[in-house]
């Protein structure tokens, strides 16, 4: 895949600390989910491995508790 064919999604800054990442903080978690409802990769979010794991676990918990949808049906 050529670089021009890749998605040109703007990357997020890694200013998140691990103590703020919580499954109840839906506004923060939505920053790490794509338009289609997928969890964004570390390359896209620029998080450390520990932060990415924490975000992933929090998103999965929020999905199970129905705070976040599993898929985004709006698009």
From Swiss-Prot:
Pfam families listed in its UniProt record: Ribosomal_S18
UniProtKB keywords: Chloroplast, Plastid, Ribonucleoprotein, Ribosomal protein, RNA-binding, rRNA-binding
Keyword Mitochondrion attributed: no
Gene Ontology biological process: translation
Compartment(s): Plastid, Chloroplast
Top-rank taxon: Eukaryota
GO cellular component, as recorded: chloroplast; mitochondrial small ribosomal subunit
GO molecular function annotations of the record: small ribosomal subunit rRNA binding; structural constituent of ribosome
Subunit structure: Part of the 30S ribosomal subunit.
Cross-referenced PANTHER family: 30S RIBOSOMAL PROTEIN S18 (PTHR13479), SMALL RIBOSOMAL SUBUNIT PROTEIN BS18M (PTHR13479:SF40)
HAMAP family in the cross-refs: Ribosomal_bS18 (MF_00270)
Family named by the database record: Belongs to the bacterial ribosomal protein bS18 family.
Name of protein: Small ribosomal subunit protein bS18c
Species of origin: Psilotum nudum (Whisk fern)
